């Protein structure tokens, strides 16, 4: 729904999934307020008028802009659902773009028309749960060669690519100056830029991939002394970035 088509006082029929979430998960009753979103920036503040029928009345609404400094997760395919866990948590944290990656050591395989549907459902569900107004953009699955191209484009556009690797010598603290500089530049000129976080599969990123990404301009760093799972490394890095960018205020 377009914000131009809305007015305060209008009554809306909630989609069945939203109605179930409001009644069963949130335990809302008639007269309780709730927030709705179309996943494209429109946020609606409403009051539930008929919980059983899913009827809500619009109180106010507005369009929320996307952040100037965008966060993207390049997540390698991982077995036993670790990749889906990663994008779920990343969405709750505030990731703006998700790029599936068929890494050299990925055991799981991307199945067009099936895996992308599952990932999209995860993103939409996490968006709804976290009350976000924007659903993260889901890109097509990329190969390692295409990730190299992403790194090269990032260098040209003034973006940043951070590769998480357990054997890296550079620490996250050493990247913070560059992160702050990129954020300040975005605020000054208003031109959107993206910070990409790249996470490998269970078997890690191959030496050949690390070398190729580094030559293409990516920063390779380690997140502390503990080895993180494929499901947690990305969300941890995104949390640090969100805090550095002032999203956690």
Model-identified regions with their sequence ranges:
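Fold-independent oxyanion-binding glycine-rich loops
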Residues: 3-4, 16-17, 39, 77, ...
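Hydrophobic side chains in well-ordered alpha-helices
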Residues: 22, 83-86, 209
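Short connector loops at helix/strand junctions that flank enzyme active sites
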Residues: 29, 43, 66-70, 93, ...
């Amino acid at each position: 729904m377009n914000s131009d088509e809305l007015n305060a006082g209008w009554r809306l029929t909630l989609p069945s999934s939203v109605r179930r979430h409001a009644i069963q998960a949130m335990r809302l009753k008639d007269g309780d307020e709730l927030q709705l979103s179309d996943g494209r920036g429109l946020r609606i503040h409403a009051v539930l008028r008929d919980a059983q029928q899913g009827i809500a009345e619009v109180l106010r609404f507005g369009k929320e802009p996307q952040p100037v400094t965008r966060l993207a997760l390049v997540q390698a395919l991982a077995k036993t659902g670790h990749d889906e866990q990663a994008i779920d948590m990343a969405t709750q944290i505030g990731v703006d773009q998700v790029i599936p990656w068929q890494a050299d050591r990925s055991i799981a395989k991307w199945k067009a028309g099936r895996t992308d549907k599952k990932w999209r459902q995860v993103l939409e569900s996490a968006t709804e749960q976290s009350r976000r107004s924007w659903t993260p953009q889901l890109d097509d699955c990329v190969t390692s060669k295409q990730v190299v191209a992403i790194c090269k484009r990032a260098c040209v556009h003034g973006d940043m690519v951070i590769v998480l690797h357990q054997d890296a010598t550079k620490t996250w603290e050493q990247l913070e100056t560059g992160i702050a500089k990129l954020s300040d530049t975005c605020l000054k000129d208003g031109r959107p830029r993206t910070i990409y976080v790249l996470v490998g599969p269970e078997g890690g990123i191959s030496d050949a991939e690390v070398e190729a990404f580094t030559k293409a301009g990516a920063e390779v760093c380690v997140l502390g002394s503990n080895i993180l799972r494929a499901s947690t490394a990305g969300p941890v890095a995104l949390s640090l970035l969100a805090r550095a960018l002032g999203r956690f205020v």
